[in-house]
Amino acid sequence: MDKNDLVQKAKLAEQAERYDDMAAAMKAVTEQGGELSNEERNLLSVAYKNVVGARRSSWRVISSIEQKTEGNEKKQQMAREYREKIEAELQDICKDVLALLDNYLIANATQAESKVFYLKMKGDYYRYLSEVASGDSKKTTVENSQQAYQEAFDISKKDMQPTHPIRLGLALNFSVFYYEILNSPEQACSLAKAAFDEAIAELDTLNEDSYKDSTLIMQLLRDNLTLWTSENQGDEGDAGEGEN
C-alpha cells in the first residue's frame, strides 16, 4: 500500500480507536524506510502507546488478582496463565517497536529532536519490558532502558531548550524510571526538579505551538515531585506516577 494511504488508514483507525490497526499501518509506513515526518512520528508513537498501554494496564490488574488468590490453587493457576498470556503479548509489542527503532528510526533520524524522541521511545519500551521481566532478562532490559534514556538526555541537554516538550517528556519518563524501576527516589526527584526548574527559568523561550504540551508536562513533573516527596516522608501516597 502507498505510504499516504497507510497514513490515512492510521488516522481513520485512530478516530475509530482501533489502535492495533493504527500500529500495523504505521509499522508498514516505517518499514518503507526513510525519515518519518513529525506527524507520522506522532501517529506511530500514539498507536503503540495505546496498544502497549492496554496490556500494561491488564497485566497490573491480573497480577494483583493473582496475589489475592493465594491459598486457592486453581484460581491462582488460572490467573497466572492469563497473566503470562498478557505478558507474551506485551513482550511481542515491545520487541516490534524496538526492532523498528533499531532498524529504521534511530538510524534515519537527522535532527537532534527526532533522535531524542526515538531514544526516549527506546528507553520507554525497554522499561515496559523490565516491568514484567525477572532475573537476568530484567537486568538486561533495565540496563538497555537506562542507556537509551541517558543518551537521549545528553543530546537533549546539548541541543534542545529546557522548555521543549520532548526534552521535558524525556525528563518525566527518565525520572519515573529512576523511581519505579531503579527504586532511587532521590535521583528521581533530583532529575524531575532540575527539569522543572530549568524550564521555569526559561519560560520566555516557550514556543507558542508547544505551550500547552510543555506546561502539561511541567505540571506532571511537579505532581510526581509532590507525590514522591510525601511518600518518602512516610505518608500514604497513590503510586500513579504521571508519565509521557
UniProtKB/Swiss-Prot annotation:
The record marks R56, R127 as: Interaction with phosphoserine on interacting protein. SMART domains: 14_3_3. Expressed in brain, gill, heart, intestine, kidney, liver, ovary, skin, spleen and testis. Pfam families: 14-3-3. One of its GO terms (cellular component) is cytoplasm. The modification N-acetylmethionine is found at M1. InterPro entries: 14-3-3, 14-3-3_CS, 14-3-3_dom_sf, 14-3-3_domain. Keywords: Acetylation, Cytoplasm. PROSITE patterns: 1433_1, 1433_2. Its main location: cytoplasm. Induction: Repressed under stress conditions such as netting. It is found in: Cytoplasm. Homodimer, and heterodimer with other family members. Adapter protein implicated in the regulation of a large spectrum of both general and specialized signaling pathways. Binds to a large number of partners, usually by recognition of a phosphoserine or phosphothreonine motif. Binding generally results in the modulation of the activity of the binding partner. Belongs to the 14-3-3 family. This is 14-3-3 protein beta/alpha-1. It comes from Oncorhynchus mykiss.
